[in-house]
Amino acid sequence: IRKFGLGAAPNSWDALTRAMQAKGYTTEELQMAGLIVIKDAEEATADRPARPRRAFDMFRNRAIFPIIDQYGNVLAFGGRAIENVQPKYLNTSDTPIFNKRLGVYAANLLRKERHLERVVLVEGYMDVVSLTQFGVTGVCATLGTALTNEQAKLLKRFAPMVYLSYDGDSAGQHAILRGLDILEAEGIPARVLDFPDGLDPDEFIRRDGKEGFDKLPALTPQAYRMRRLRAEHDLTTQEGRTAYAKACAAILRNLEPVEMENALQELIVQTGFS
């Protein structure tokens, strides 16, 4: 809890507003910081009386995750619902000091770790906390967005390689493909961790621990893309194998000779072509 500065927001519409106003902050300052939402006054209608201008806490009944930059500055907050309500995750909107495209969650911890061989990029705050709790180093998460070029550049400052460790659902798999494109555009080597049984990172490490995590297959970008293409084609038919081979050709053409030879051998085994 102390390592990540975790906290909680009470189930109240204005607990934070009242506490911060008591310290001298105005509603305008709290709104600019992304901590409250202000609703303008509403005139009376036939169905209800007039309503005054009101301020509501942004985070209510949520576990709170401070978003801290690599220099130790608290820039924003993320909140996870304690009860089964939507949205499950809620983040501070962009403010004069915070842009979710530019940073990653746990950047402050990455800076403290020395000689990292790779950064493990996950989808959510809970995955970061869970993997770190089990002893995995170099873990961080994007801030409710797909990986951006700016975030990739930041990760490159901490380690020479990025391991994508996303959920196995369709959204997670799509995010992996986009992430690989971004990392390759920035010249950053990448791998994709292959979780079994449809488990997400948190579920897997709670089942298999750090020892199991360290043994996970780390797929090259081309191996991952070929696997995705294979799932989209029927390799029991000649037409499916031909379409699959053609789709893979676009992936293989930019590989180094040794990598291309290995990938071609795998493709020959899968399709029967030579």
What is each model feature region?
Residues 10-14, 23-29, 107, 152, ...:
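Alpha-helix initiation and N-capping motif
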Residues 13-162, 175-176:
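Phosphate-handling DNA/RNA-contact segment within nucleic-acid enzymes
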Residues 147-225:
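Conserved phosphate-handling catalytic cores of large alpha/beta enzymes
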Residues 189-267, 271:
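C-terminal or mid-to-C-terminal helical accessory/interaction module adjacent to the motor/catalytic core
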Residues 274:
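Electropositive nucleic-acid-contacting surfaces
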